[in-house]
Structures are given as structure tokens and as C-alpha cells.
């Protein structure tokens, strides 16, 4: 689960005596300001310091920091828990970053996983560059490792299991790749050119199984993890309502996912081979990702339809906060 609920606290009452030294009074005032600042953690909106960001993915840490993958600038932006504006955290096109999509904060490993992809590869066109899953230290944004996708492809989204295994979707090749804890290279864990075509969002629930959606097919699937770690038969889940272009997806409970699709934020509850879809908010434009932190589900507006049209101003980008309590 990425998010957790923070309880609001009233700022402490500070009493001053006229005989108290000025230094102590200043320190006491600082305590009040810090306490008040922490109460602003439920930021209703996050903006960006730069234009043409096109934030395709986002993730968060327990302290409320938000990280965004910038598809427009091939960079990673961060908004700290005390800020309502995201600024560059990993510089544009540094460390071989290209076509930045998925990001995932793995606090247990102290790593921010980032999807970086080669261009081309569609309709038989050759790939240019290298598709890789990159690991950056959460402590200082330095590059810790880079793991190429065999045969390139399009690294789209990332999830991490309790045992440290990292899974990443490949949208172009219809597969899920795996990086075992301590491994030096990715391996192809699950592959099906038809069923996993346009594989996009990925998450794990308490059952330890891998859940993947397809942005092009509007489907949600479960891939069992066998005792030896290999992938079991892919199961297409029956959703209670159609899903239109499902994209970013995060686990927020034992059987619950948050999913963005068709301009909506959904709460999806898994029961066997069925998925109950509850719309939490609709009418949003160009949303592609969601994360939960501090009792707020943040949804990123990517507006990807304007990315390749330089004649149109996409306007300022933002991530909207929607109050949500994890189950």
C-alpha cells in the first residue's frame, strides 16, 4: 500500500512570560509555525515550476512527498510534503532518461524506480536508444542501477512485491518483466501478445498476485505468482462496469485498487474473478495516474493529447487531491 492516513493535530499552545529570554520566545514561535505547516499536508492541488511537463505518472512516500515522471521533459519532479509545487528532482535527460513514464517509490529499498524507454518500435519501426528500468536513491536522487529491457519495448508502470521483487509492464510487447531482489538483470516473467497487449498499470494486492490493466483493451487481469515465483495462467477479471482506457493503478487495501480511466478515479474491489468498480470522481480531463498519501488520492493531469502539438499551449499542469480513506 502506498498511502496511509495522517491524523490532524491541533498546534500546541505556547504561553510566554514577560521575563522569558527573547531566544526562548523565538524558538517557541518557531514550534508553532512548524506545527501549523504540518497541518497543510492535505494539499488540495500540486502545481509545477515548469511548463510542458506532461506528468504521466506519480508516486508517493509515507511522509507525503510526491514524485512525478515528466514525459514532456524526460525528468522527475518532486513536491515535498511541505510544498504544493513540484520542482526538478532528477534533471532532464540525465542518466540516460528518455520517454519517462512510470515511477514508483520503494521505501523499503530506499529506491525510486523509473521507467525510461527508447523511441520507435511501433509498426515495425526500429528502436532508437535503450529501454530500461532505472533505480535512483530516494535519499539523494543519485543513480543506483539501470536494467535494460531485453529487446527494448516500452516500460510503462512499476510495482514491487513484499519480497522486493520488482515488476514492470511493457506496453509495446505485451509482457511483464521481473527483477528479482539482488538480480543484475530483468527477465521476462509473463508474456502474451494478445491478452497483455497494451499492458499499462500494475499493482500487487495482499494475496501476493500481480494485477495488470490494458489501456487499449479496457481490461483488468490477474497473474498468479506460483510458489516458485513463476507466472501462472492470466485471468481476465469481470468488471461491474466497463473501463475506458485504464491507466495508472495503485493498491490501497487488501483487495482494493485505485484506478484512473476515462476521466474517472475508481475504487476497484477484487472478489475472486470479479471486480466491483465504484466511481469516486468523474469529469476529469487527461488523467493518467494516481497515488495515495496522507488521506489524499492525488490524480495527475497528463493531457497527452497535446504533447506532440507545439502550436497549442497545454496550460499549467496540476495534480488534484481527492480525499480518500484506505480500507
Task: Give the residues covered by each predicted segment.
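Beta-rich, blade/repeat-based domains predominating
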Residues: 49-65, 71, 94-120, 149-166, ...
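Short loop/turn segments immediately following the C-termini of beta-strands
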Residues: 71, 117-119, 171-172, 215, ...
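Asp-box/WD-like beta-propeller blade repeats and closely related beta-sheet repeat scaffolds
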Residues: 127-161
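Short loop/turn segments that connect beta-strands within beta-propeller blades
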Residues: 80-84, 137-141, 180-184, 224-229, ...
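Short, solvent-exposed loop/turn segments at conserved positions within beta-propeller repeat blades
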Residues: 72, 122-130, 171-172, 215-217, ...
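A short beta-strand motif characteristic of beta-propeller blades
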Residues: 43-48, 85-93, 142-148, 185-192, ...
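Structural signal for beta-propeller blades
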Residues: 74-77, 121-122, 133, 174-177, ...
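Blade-level signature of beta-propeller repeat domains, shared across WD40, Kelch, NHL, RCC1
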Residues: 295-327
Amino acid at each position: 500500500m502506498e498511502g496511509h492516513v495522517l491524523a490532524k493535530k491541533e498546534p500546541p499552545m505556547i504561553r510566554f512570560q514577560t521575563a522569558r529570554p527573547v531566544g526562548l520566545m523565538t524558538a517557541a514561535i518557531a514550534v508553532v509555525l512548524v506545527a501549523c505547516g504540518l497541518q497543510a499536508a492535505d494539499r488540495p492541488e500540486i502545481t509545477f515550476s515548469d511548463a510542458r511537463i506532461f506528468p504521466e505518472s506519480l508516486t508517493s512516500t509515507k511522509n507525503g512527498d510526491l514524485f512525478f515522471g515528466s514525459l514532456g521533459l524526460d525528468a522527475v519532479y518532486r513536491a515535498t510534503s511541505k510544498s504544493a509545487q513540484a520542482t526538478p528532482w532528477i534533471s532532464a535527460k540525465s542518466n540516460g532518461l528518455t520517454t519517462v513514464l512510470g515511477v514508483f517509490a520503494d521505501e523499503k529499498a530506499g529506491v525510486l524506480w523509473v521507467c525510461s524507454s527508447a523511441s520507435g518500435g511501433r509498426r515495425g519501426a526500429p528502436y532508437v536508444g535503450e529501454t530500461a528500468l532505472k533505480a535512483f536513491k530516494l535519499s539523494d536522487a543519485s543513480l543506483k542501477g539501470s536494467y535494460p529491457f531485453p529487446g527494448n519495448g516500452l516500460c510503462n508502470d512499476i510495482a514491487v512485491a513484499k519480497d522486493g521483487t520488482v515488476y514492470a509492464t511493457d506496453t509495446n510487447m505485451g509482457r511483464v518483466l521481473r527483477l528479482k531482489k539482488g538480480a543484475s538483470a530483468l527477465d521476462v516473467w509473463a508474456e502474451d501478445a494478445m491478452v497483455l497487449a497494451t499492458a499499462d498499470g500494475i499493482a500487487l494486492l495482499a494475496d501476493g498476485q500481480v494485477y495488470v490493466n490494458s489501456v487499449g483493451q479496457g481490461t483488468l487481469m490477474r497473474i498468479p505468482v506460483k510458489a516458485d515465483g513463476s507466472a501462472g495462467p492470466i485471468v481476465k477479471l469481470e468488471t461491474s462496469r466497463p473501463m475506458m482506457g485504464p491507466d495508472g493503478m495503485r493498491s490501497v487495501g487488501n483487495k482494493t485498487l485505485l484506478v484512473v480511466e476515462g476521466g474517472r478515479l475508481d475504487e476497484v474491489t477484487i472478489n475472486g474473478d470479479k471486480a466491483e468498480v465504484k466511481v469516486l470522481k468523474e469529469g476529469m480531463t487527461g488523467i493518467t495516474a494516481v497515488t495515495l498519501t496522507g488521506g489524499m488520492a492525488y490524480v495527475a493531469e497528463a493531457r497527452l493529447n497535446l504533447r506532440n502539438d507545439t502550436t497549442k499551449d497545454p496550460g499549467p499542469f496540476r495534480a488534484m487531491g481527492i480525499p480518500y480513506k484506505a480500507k
